């Protein structure tokens, strides 16, 4: 029997309803901050991700789904969303003054060839928000505040921590990297990190195998320029003034090479589980790397699979099955088909979710199906109802019944 590819999922029934509720609520939150949705292609040029993510990253070196098209062009299923948005900004000239700051978001599937595990899939879904054209610390605050609003609005505050750091971009970067390499020589590193330490030592701190042993890593804060120190402190002060609690983490570097300056991760830490659910920061050089245009940018990404798993774990009310149908009709005779369809059309015209027993079944089976759907109203139609054009509406909530006709049907439902 054919099965779905490893690391992918099928969504249906209650699971799909939960996803739609989550996505709808996320869009409502982002609309309040005046962010508009962007949709980019599912596949892009391979070169786009080499330029943006970095050739030494795990994503580019190991995890991309690559293919060559009929004209011998190297393409990949997009492994992350930011590079695609930057490409769209440059290609469509969204850096023009009239558009700035360009505030946008996406909800999209991504693809990475990695080992499937709890909360990690080869096809996964990501919410991303992006802001282009603003280098203000207020913009950094807004980005983290949106993430914080998402956590609060979904009532997931329990076991949540926000970690921050500031990646060196100034003249002291090379000095810090030398100090870091010196520190790392005392450790036995995994094969990947032995390569990273030569190409990009900062990436060693993001290693999921070795990171637990780096307890006294040199602090980036000690190497920041006066200007960087001032900006980072002003950003942290603003968070504190606005009652957003953060924790500085010297080892926080992010898994993508394009980040510069302020970065953050929001983690869910419970029992023996530690998962990053939202992560982002500044990437002021990325638009230049891709499109040769100086344009500051910041944003974050959120894995929806992990986020929805936490909703389920915390027994969030969004995960509760609410009444999913307003009206169910049971049609027991061929002569009642027209009346049945007329009732359904009328009920849907006033916004009721309505269904019927289209599958040929007995009254007993149809009533069992009705009990499963738990409708507010139930109507049973047979030859008698078709002949008289009268039928009974059963209110399953308050256990009342009313006899009506098509003419009075809508009024009698109110």
From Swiss-Prot:
PROSITE patterns: AA_TRNA_LIGASE_II
GO BP term, example: histidyl-tRNA aminoacylation
Cellular localisation: Cytoplasm
EC number(s) from the headed UniProt entry: 6.1.1.21
CDD domains: HisRS-like_core (cd00773)
One Pfam family cited in the UniProt record for this chain: tRNA-synt_His
Any single Gene Ontology cellular-component annotation: cytoplasm
GO molecular function, one term: ATP binding
Keywords for this protein: Aminoacyl-tRNA synthetase, ATP-binding, Cytoplasm, Ligase, Nucleotide-binding, Protein biosynthesis
Subunit architecture: Homodimer.
Similarity section: Belongs to the class-II aminoacyl-tRNA synthetase family.
HAMAP family in the cross-refs: His_tRNA_synth
The protein's name: Histidine--tRNA ligase
This protein's encoding gene: hisS
């Amino acid at each position: 029997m054919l099965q779905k590819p490893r690391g992918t999922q099928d969504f249906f029934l209650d699971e799909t309803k939960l996803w739609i509720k989550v996505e709808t609520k996320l869009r409502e939150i982002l609309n309040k901050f005046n962010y508009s949705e962007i949709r980019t292609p599912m596949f892009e040029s391979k070169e786009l991700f080499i330029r943006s993510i970095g050739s030494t990253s795990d994503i580019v070196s190991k995890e991309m789904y690559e293919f060559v098209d009929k004209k011998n062009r190297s393409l990949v299923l997009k492994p992350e969303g930011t590079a695609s948005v930057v490409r769209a900004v440059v290609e469509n000239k969204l850096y023009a003054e009239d558009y700035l700051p360009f505030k946008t978001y996406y909800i999209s599937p991504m693809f990475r060839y990695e080992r499937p595990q709890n909360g990690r899939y080869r096809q996964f879904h990501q919410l991303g928000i992006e802001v282009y054209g603003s280098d203000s610390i207020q913009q950094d605050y807004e980005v983290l505040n949106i993430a914080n609003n998402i956590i609060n609005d979904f009532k997931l505050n329990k076991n949540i921590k926000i970690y921050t750091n500031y990646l060196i971009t100034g003249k002291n970067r090379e000095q810090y990297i030398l100090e870091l390499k010196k520190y790392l020589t005392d450790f036995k590193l995994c094969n990947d990190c032995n390569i990273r330490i030569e190409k990009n030592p900062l990436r060693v701190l993001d290693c999921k195998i070795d990171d637990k042993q780096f307890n006294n890593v040199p602090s980036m804060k000690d190497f920041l320029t006066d200007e960087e120190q001032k900006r980072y402190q002003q950003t942290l002060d603003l968070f504190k003034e606005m009652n957003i609690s953060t924790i500085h983490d010297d080892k926080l570097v992010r898994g993508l090479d394009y980040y510069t300056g302020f970065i953050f991760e929001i983690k869910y830490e419970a029992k023996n589980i530690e998962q990053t659910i939202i992560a982002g920061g500044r990437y002021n050089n990325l638009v230049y790397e891709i499109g040769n245009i100086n344009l500051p940018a910041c944003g974050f990404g959120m894995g929806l699979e992990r986020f929805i798993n936490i909703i389920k774990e915390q027994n969030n009310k969004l995960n509760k099955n609410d009444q999913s149908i307003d009206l169910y009709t049971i049609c027991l005779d061929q002569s009642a088909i027209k009346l049945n369809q007329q009732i359904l059309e009328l009920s849907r015209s006033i916004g009721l979710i309505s269904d019927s027993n289209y599958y040929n079944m007995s009254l007993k089976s149809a009533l069992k199906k009705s009990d499963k759907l738990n409708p507010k109203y139930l109507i049973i139609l047979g030859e008698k109802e078709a002949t008289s054009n009268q039928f009974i509406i059963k209110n399953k909530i308050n256990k009342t019944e009313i006899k009506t006709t098509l003419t009075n049907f809508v009024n009698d439902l109110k």
